[in-house]
Swiss-Prot record:
Subunit-level organization: Part of the 50S ribosomal subunit.
GO BP of this protein: translation
Coiled-coil ranges per UniProt: none
GO molecular function, one term: structural constituent of ribosome
Organism expressing this protein natively: Corynebacterium diphtheriae (strain ATCC 700971 / NCTC 13129 / Biotype gravis)
Name the record gives this protein: Large ribosomal subunit protein uL30
Family in the record: Belongs to the universal ribosomal protein uL30 family.
Lineage: Bacteria, Bacillati, Actinomycetota, Actinomycetes, Mycobacteriales
Length: 61
């Protein structure tokens, strides 16, 4: 199972922890999407920025 993560809000006003998590996820700008494996590490990073992103489960690796 994989997760499609899409950034919906910008980083203006975000704290440094949120900025680092967005960079670690590979998200650079609004409406940018990335696909990551569904792991506890990725889920934790998404949880930190949950108000800035949307998450969908997609099939595949």
């Amino acid at each position: 199972m994989a997760l499609k993560i899409t950034q919906h809000k910008g980083l203006v006003g975000a704290n440094p922890k949120q900025r680092k998590n967005m960079a670690a996820l590979g998200l650079k700008h609004i409406n940018h999407s990335v696909v990551h494996q569904d792991t506890p590490v990725v889920r934790g990073m998404v949880n930190v920025v949950r108000h800035m992103v949307s998450v969908e489960e997609v099939a595949g690796e």
